[in-house]
Amino acid sequence: MTGDINKLFMRATRKAMIGWETNLTADEIVQELWVWYLESPYIQKKLGELRPGEAVIYVRKQVHNILSGSAKARDLFQERSHYSSDNVKDALRGESTNRYLVDILPLAMKELGSKNERHAEAIRVRYDDGVVPERGSAAEAMLKRAVKSLTEHVNIIAITAGVERDDNGKVIVKDGPGSKHAIFPDIRKVQGEGHSDPTANIAIMLVEHPGLRDEYLYEPPIPEFLGGRCYAKSA
């Protein structure tokens, strides 16, 4: 029975993901479907009553809900982001003239490593060891995801430090430890500790804690610089 349900979830997920741009993998979505299924006796009963084709359609609608929630969270976060993946790659190569970005990059890398060591290692292999993955390979795809994830952590640190852009688009630091170029995660402001930007609070929480997306987006819940081996060189 469990195997049949898992096959159903995977089939519905693959169908629903066609045409969607998402950071979520099929396995991650299937995990979310299991939570959705196990937490609701009604869903269990409903799927047991539906014909195979109908069940796929029913589950596919839930996958669309998950994907929509993920997209909303991503869009909300990106509205508050100041650094792009290209900015981060310049810093990783030691080519960035942005001292602030170079200083917070090790902290972002530490966060990345604590959440996904494979991503952290992919970045170390490329930017420390100098090994360029073959074009079109799984290693290249992994590296792209790793840099994108690292960029998210960089922006989380920047947002919580009060980083904004002036009228000319230049990144400035309004307050907090970032005014001295370096920020430490243990003194980052959070909601209820004087942060003046509730939108940033929500965006950060949605990225750091996917389980909270249901509360803020009214959708079902959705399922970290080089640390240790290298350092960023300031220009």
UniProtKB/Swiss-Prot annotation:
Superkingdom, natural source: Viruses
Name of the protein described by the UniProt record: Gene 53 protein
Species assigned in the record: Mycobacterium phage D29 (Mycobacteriophage D29)
Gene this chain is encoded by: 53
